[in-house]
Amino acid sequence: MKKLHDLVILENVLIAKETYKMSLKAETMDFVELAPGNFINIKIDKGGAPLLRRPISIFDADEEQKVLKIIYKDLGYGTHLMTKLLPGDILNVLGPLGTGFPIENTPDAALLVGGGVGIPPLYELGKRLRDKGTKVTSVLGFRDAQSMFCLEDFRTLGEVYISTEDGSFGQKGFVTDAITSHDPDFDTIYACGPKVMLKALDDAYKGKKEGYLSFEERMACGIGACYACMIDTKDGLKRVCKDGPVFKLGEVTYE
């Protein structure tokens, strides 16, 4: 499968506080082999800087239209440059990359748990689970109401519960508070977000539920060659970009 692609930007719009959605025409990408939880590594050219590509998870993959959608936050120099890109601009990407969420054996009921910029990859996963007959419940955590995005997209998958840190919408606190409050029924948990959130879910459910956690780490090459994104697991150090970003519940040791 070809990994380097020049994709045409179709849309690049602000959808929430410091949060953008970008649509990309991906004629050369093999959508059949694209797994939920995969990411693309984006090259941003601006006088030769920044040097490193930016890893961004895939929010939505439309095989029929050959369109990829990503959601990103304006958090630094590289992503700020991305906000200036316009429809018709060409974006060089490496991908799809990483080991995504397994969906061969789908559960009867799934719980999707996302925090902040960890929310986007769960949507493509939820679509595929729903289409296979799984009951999907989503718990999404944001800093505040102004930071919320794509709620209607997730509502097409099933029940959605929201937490905000300041209590401006939904449950005040974190996703773990919303889970405790609503107590959704599920067989398998799928989550992506800050490591502190993933650890809390790991501690709560390992040995009790099946689950998969997608980790966010700083990356360089995106293909496992540079060893810049190592993570501790019970089987030793692993590369988030290649062996992950998705790991089984209980696999990461958080050392």
Protein language model regions, located:
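Ferredoxin-reductase
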Residues: 2-87
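FNR/FR-type flavoprotein reductase catalytic core
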Residues: 77-216
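Local cysteine-cluster metal-coordination motifs and their immediate loop/turn environment
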Residues: 121, 216-245
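Short microdomains enriched in Cys/His and/or Lys/Arg
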Residues: 243-255
